[in-house]
UniProtKB/Swiss-Prot annotation:
The name this protein goes by in its record: tRNA U34 carboxymethyltransferase
InterPro entries, alphabetized: CmoB (IPR010017), Mo5U34_MeTrfas-like (IPR027555), SAM-dependent_MTases_sf (IPR029063)
Pfam family of the protein (one): Methyltransf_9
Presence of the UniProt keyword S-adenosyl-L-methionine in the record: no
Domain of life where this protein originates: Bacteria
Disulfide bonds: none
One annotated GO molecular function: transferase activity, transferring alkyl or aryl (other than methyl) groups
Enzymatic reactions: carboxy-S-adenosyl-L-methionine + 5-hydroxyuridine(34) in tRNA = 5-carboxymethoxyuridine(34) in tRNA + S-adenosyl-L-homocysteine + H(+)
């Protein structure tokens, strides 16, 4: 099993200590009752990875690690083989001892769009909701975060995160927990909460915003990145069965409507910070994610539309404060 004991020890004397009233029992129940059918296979790959300590570690500009003595061809091939058993890799990229994990998403591009608009992360305790393999957690650490906690119920992502952590020297400044936001008590303990690429997957988006608010300290900052459509404060797209081939897309508001939603939930100082059309340079099929990607989800004759005829993916970043 993956050991969360170090995380429990880490939070025992800080503002997250009251989480220990519920968290260990939740994780124990997950380990007992809810493991994915392939979890043992993924965990076996994780166990067989060497625990490396990098001589050069860059989390500020990328997630990359190097050793003073290059790995042998055999070592590198073995590590790459083990990492490939954890495919598909969706969020990255990672560069680890000469192995470049070219993920489906260039998550570094999103980070470059978000970072200029937020309160500096130095010394902050951070929650990243729907964190995937944890790429952005490492970038948060690189930006000076004291502690970056990610939650994501997808167990493959947890194993990918732990694999990267093992190759980064067992760094304990970032952690991923196999939970959804709805499983968290109202901690009111995080300085910054990120929700990126999650809102449109929620059946009740306003409930999601309230849940995010419940995790923030007073004057804490929410960083919300999500799909939007063009339009005024009354514009919300409710797709049919699929949007860009995704079945679980429920509401896509305009940025103006989303600003209203945030204010309705009690957030203040709401700013629409960035718009970005998703391109096939940012989301694409790679050797580490071999199934369909954005190019397959767009109308082959009109890239401004999805295959279903909806507007192609447009993403916005909004920043807000909990009073």
């Amino acid at each position: 099993m993956i050991d969360f004991g170090k995380f429990y020890q880490q939070i025992a004397c800080g503002p997250l200590a009251h989480w220990l009233e519920t968290l260990p029992a939740q994780v124990a129940a997950w380990q007992r009752d809810a493991l994915h059918g392939q979890f043992k296979q993924w965990k076996n790959s994780l166990d067989n990875l060497p625990a490396l300590v990098p001589d050069q570690l860059d989390l500020l500009h990328s997630v990359s690690a190097q050793s003073a003595e290059p790995l042998s061809d055999g070592q590198r091939k073995r590590i790459e083989q083990l990492l490939r058993t954890l495919m598909p890799w969706r969020k990255g990229p990672f560069s680890l001892y000469g192995i470049d994990i070219d993920t489906e998403w260039r998550s570094d591009l999103k980070w470059d769009r978000v970072l200029p608009h937020i309160t500096p992360l130095a010394g902050r305790t951070i929650l990243d909701v729907g964190c995937g393999s944890g790429y952005h957690l490492w970038r948060m650490v690189g930006a000076g975060a004291q502690l970056a906690v990610g939650i994501d119920p997808t167990q493959l992502f947890l194993c990918q995160f732990e694999a990267v952590r093992k190759l980064l020297g067992g760094d304990n400044r970032a952690h991923v927990l196999p939970l959804g936001i709805e499983q968290m008590p109202a901690l009111n303990a995080f300085d910054t909460v990120f929700s990126m690429g999650v809102l449109y997957h929620r059946r009740s988006p306003l409930d999601h915003l309230w849940q995010l608010k419940d995790q923030l300290v007073k004057d804490g900052e929410l960083v919300l990145e999500t799909l939007v459509v063009e339009g005024d404060e009354n514009t919300v797209l409710v797709p049919g069965e699929r949007y860009a081939q995704m079945r679980n897309v429920y509401f896509i508001p305009s940025a103006a409507a989303l600003k209203n939603w945030l204010e309705k939930c009690g957030f203040v100082d709401v700013k629409i910070a960035d718009f970005s059309v998703t391109t096939v340079e940012e989301q694409r099929r790679t050797a580490w994610m071999e199934t369909e990607s954005l190019a397959d989800f767009l109308d082959p004759h009109d890239a401004t539309k999805t295959r279903e005829g909806y507007p192609a993916p447009l993403r916005a970043v909004l920043v807000a404060r909990k009073p």
